[in-house]
């Protein structure tokens, strides 16, 4: 396979990301339409469904930072405690052209990190004590550049909205299934095409939406890797950091299925989990792509 540049990797992932987002919104519209049609709610039902989507997106957008940090049990470090960490974050933030995010430490031995925040002006980078214990400065720069790239690319906002959309699809789909099976109207709809179609949508849409959310998370990880490599101009730093993280991996106690997509590597035990259901790409593949970018960069330097 031909090595690719940072720019090619980023543009490819942008296209894939927006395609996935479009499909998730289409599925949500499809499920809302099925619910409205099945219960004969008419225009009022469509308006109500739209308002529900609008409100849940707004609430998640405003409160996601506070909820995630409180649940994760993080603390703010002093400059005397981790001066090099604060210096790295400040330097890379300036290079990325964003305000310096707040820094928090999670006292967990597992090496990991994540970023959160609705926009670059209200962003946070969290690193575990385990990460700081095993990485050298170059590797730490790669990890922090990855998290800053998530912030600059508005990935937290995107992931939050996607999670809300998928959650709504699951809730509406489940409600539609229950109504089909248990309501009195079932006897009148056994042979009704609309009822059968609604049931099929209720079964398939939540499953497909969940797969798409995982696919979206994987694409944003690839994009953050490429953006981090472009920011540091040294893909090997992040590649080496990922190798160390994988070697020293252990599950994070305070992580859950909702916060897992935020981390640089999946913080949960991944025993027998299919690639389709993974929130993160395989670490080996991420390392391979980063090193391919490094090779391409060296080739371009020689040609130039």
From Swiss-Prot:
Needs which cofactor?
Zn(2+)
Membrane topology per the entry is: Multi-pass membrane protein
In the UniProt record, does the keyword Membrane occur?
Answer: yes
What biological process terms from GO does the record include? Answer: proteolysis
Report the locations given in the UniProt record: Cell inner membrane
| Cofactor comment text | Binds 1 zinc ion per subunit.
Which HAMAP family does its entry note? Answer: Pept_M48_protease_HtpX
Superkingdom to which the source organism belongs: Bacteria
**Main localization category:** membrane
Q: Where is the active site?
A: 147
Q: Which family does it belong to?
A: Belongs to the peptidase M48B family.
Q: Name one GO molecular function term.
A: metalloendopeptidase activity
Q: What is the lineage of its organism?
A: Bacteria, Pseudomonadati, Dictyoglomota, Dictyoglomia, Dictyoglomales
Species source reads: Dictyoglomus turgidum (strain DSM 6724 / Z-1310)
Question: What's the Enzyme Commission number for this chain?
Answer: 3.4.24.-
Q: Which residues bind Zn(2+)?
A: 146, 150, 221
What protein name does the entry list?
Answer: Protease HtpX homolog
Question: Among its keywords, does the record have Hydrolase?
Answer: yes
Membrane-crossing ranges are 19-39, 41-61, 156-176, 192-212
Keyword annotations of the record: Cell inner membrane, Cell membrane, Hydrolase, Membrane, Metal-binding, Metalloprotease, Protease, Transmembrane, Transmembrane helix, Zinc
Cellular-component GO terms for this entry? plasma membrane
């Amino acid at each position: 396979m031909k090595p690719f540049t940072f720019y090619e990797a980023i543009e490819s992932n942008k296209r894939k990301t927006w395609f996935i987002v479009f499909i998730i919104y289409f599925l949500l519209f499809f499920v809302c339409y099925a619910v409205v049609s099945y219960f004969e709610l008419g225009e009022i039902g469509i308006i109500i469904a739209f308002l529900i989507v609008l409100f849940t997106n707004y609430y998640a957008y405003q409160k996601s930072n506070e909820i995630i940090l409180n649940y994760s049990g993080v603390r703010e470090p002093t400059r005397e405690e981790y001066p090099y960490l604060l210096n790295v974050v400040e330097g890379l933030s300036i290079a990325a052209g964003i305000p310096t995010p707040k820094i928090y430490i999670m006292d967990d031995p597992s090496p990991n990190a994540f970023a959160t925040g609705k926009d670059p002006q209200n962003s946070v980078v969290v690193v575990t004590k385990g990460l700081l214990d095993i990485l050298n400065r170059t590797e730490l720069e790669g990890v922090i550049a990855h998290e800053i790239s998530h912030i600059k690319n508005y990935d937290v906002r995107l992931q939050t909205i996607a999670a809300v959309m998928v959650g709504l699809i699951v809730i509406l789909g489940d409600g539609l299934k229950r109504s089909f099976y248990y309501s009195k109207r079932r006897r009148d709809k056994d042979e009704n095409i609309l009822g059968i179609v609604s049931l099929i949508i209720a079964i398939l849409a939540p499953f497909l939406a969940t797969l798409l959310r995982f696919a979206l998370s994987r694409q944003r990880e690839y994009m953050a890797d490429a953006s981090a490599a472009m920011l540091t101009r040294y893909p090997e730093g992040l590649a080496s950091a990922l190798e160390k993280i994988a070697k020293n991996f252990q599950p994070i106690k305070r992580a859950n299925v909702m916060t897992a997509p935020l981390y640089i590597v999946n913080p949960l035990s991944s025993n027998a989990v299919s690639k389709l259901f993974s929130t993160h790409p395989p670490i080996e593949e991420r390392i391979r792509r980063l090193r391919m970018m490094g090779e391409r960069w060296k080739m371009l330097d020689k040609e130039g």
